[in-house]
Regions:
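Long, charged amphipathic helices and adjacent flexible linkers at domain junctions
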Residues: 8-28, 107-116, 120, 191, ...
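Short flanking/linker segments adjacent to small metal-binding domains or redox-active Cys/His motifs
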Residues: 6, 13-30, 168-189, 215-226
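Rossmann-like dinucleotide/flavin-binding elements
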Residues: 217-242, 281-291, 296, 310-312, ...
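Immediate flanking context of iron-sulfur cluster ligation sites
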Residues: 9-17, 47-50, 113-122, 146-169
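Iron-sulfur cluster-binding cysteine motifs and their immediate structural context
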Residues: 1, 31-40, 44, 50-87, ...
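N-terminal Rossmann-like dinucleotide/flavin-binding domain of flavoprotein oxidoreductases
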Residues: 149-156, 167-169, 189, 251-300
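Extreme N-terminal leader/targeting segments of oxidoreductases
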Residues: 160, 176, 180-214, 234, ...
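Glycine-rich beta-alpha-beta "Rossmann" dinucleotide-binding loop(s) and their flanking helix/strand
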Residues: 302-304, 310-332
Length: 359
């Protein structure tokens, strides 16, 4: 067909309808509307009846305008998208006067960072990964665990691990504290969904875009390097990790003990990323076994993800004496099997945080 039309064959990334509004029937109204049941007609009256200028007006004009039955109005009064039926025609986007519903590609979603018009809740604002926490909690509550997991994995590829070791800053900002004296335990829900995924047999590989032909070298196989490899692979690039250690994981493996993060769980999470098509070279260190100049010959980009292995100094006399170890140094030696004979000896642990308690 392309030859007949004089064009070229190429790949255009598909886009499907999506929206950010979660208000629906719960949203506050500024007047009672009794006009034509069309969002565009309502918008002509002072921008609609919502106090929120960015919210879904809820009359379903987008649903009426969809010719592929890809949209329906949900119980909350906001449109629900069926990704399998959406063809990305854009007819819903055209008739939405509030610009709530838009076409987004996989790249759009993976590279998205919050915008000021998106009414981001306090929990998501405090989440370092910017996970859409209300969405995955809602899916989990309805038993739609795979959809819950997909929401998490668009921002965080290591839910098995974070579900066990994340300090959960999101819960500090949970509005339920003001109502029930206790936050929604988002992190436990994340762990539950990830454990459910770990237990099932037929587990799909996350959707990846077609190969771009671009190769990226990642120096370091800790959480930063693994996360970068995951997103690069999903975007169609070919990442390769170079790590100085015999196994991947970085501080997750060599700094967090078994009782908090079982190695079986860690390995499962790492292998989930590797099976997407990520190459690895172990026991090689930058500056000794290879150089940046050598990598530049074979790769289109290089990512430095060596991590933050240096310990904070106590800035006190005697901290460099024999027999004084920094916390992460001690944990790393123990994990690597370095002989540390402390039998019958008294040990002082300075500090009271996670590292001190692990040591």
């Amino acid at each position: 067909v392309a030859e007949v039309l004089g064009g070229e064959v190429g790949f255009i990334e598909p886009r499907i309808a999506d929206h950010y509004c979660t208000g629906g029937d719960r949203a506050e109204r500024k007047y009672h509307y009794e006009g034509a049941l069309d969002c565009r007609a309502m918008a002509e009256h002072y921008g609609g009846d919502l106090l929120c200028q960015y919210g879904c007006l809820g009359l379903g004009s987008c649903v009426e305008n969809c010719n592929f039955n890809a949209l329906s109005m949900g119980d909350e009064g906001i449109p629900v998208v069926n990704p399998g039926a959406c063809v990305g025609c854009g007819s819903c986007e055209e008739v939405c006067p509030s610009n709530v519903i838009e076409l987004h590609s996989l790249t759009d979603r993976l590279l998205h960072f919050r915008h000021d018009h998106e009414c981001v809740p306090p929990c998501t604002q405090l989440c370092p990964a910017q996970i859409n926490i209300p969405a995955y909690v809602d899916f989990a509550a309805k038993g739609r665990y795979e959809e819950s997991l997909n929401v998490i994995m668009e921002r965080n590829p290591l839910p098995l691990i974070c579900g066990r070791v994340c300090p959960a800053p999101c819960e500090d900002g949970c509005r339920r504290v003001d109502m029930d004296d206790e936050p929604v335990h988002h992190n436990y829900l994340k762990r539950f969904v990830a454990d459910w995924d770990m237990a099932r047999e037929d587990r799909p590989i996350p959707t990846c875009l077609p190969d771009t032909g671009k190769r990226v070298a990642i120096i370091g196989g800790g959480p930063a390097g693994l996360t970068a490899a995951y997103f690069l692979r999903r975007l169609g690039h070919s990442p390769k990790i170079y790590d100085a250690k015999p196994e991947l994981g970085g501080m997750l493996r060599y700094g967090i003990p078994e009782y908090r993060l079982p190695k079986k769980v860690l390995d499962f999470g790492i292998n989930d990323i590797l099976r997407m098509g990520v190459d690895v070279e172990y026991n090689v260190a930058l500056g000794g076994d290879f150089s940046v100049a050598e990598l530049e010959k074979d790769f289109d980009a290089i990512l430095m993800a060596m991590g933050a292995w240096d310990n904070s100094s106590l800035r006190c006399e005697g901290e460099d004496l024999d027999g004084v170890w920094k916390g992460t140094e001690f944990l790393q030696k123990r994990e690597l099997g370095t002989h540390l004979d402390l039998t019958g000896k008294r040990v002082v642990v300075v500090g009271g945080g996670n590292t001190a308690m692990d040591a």
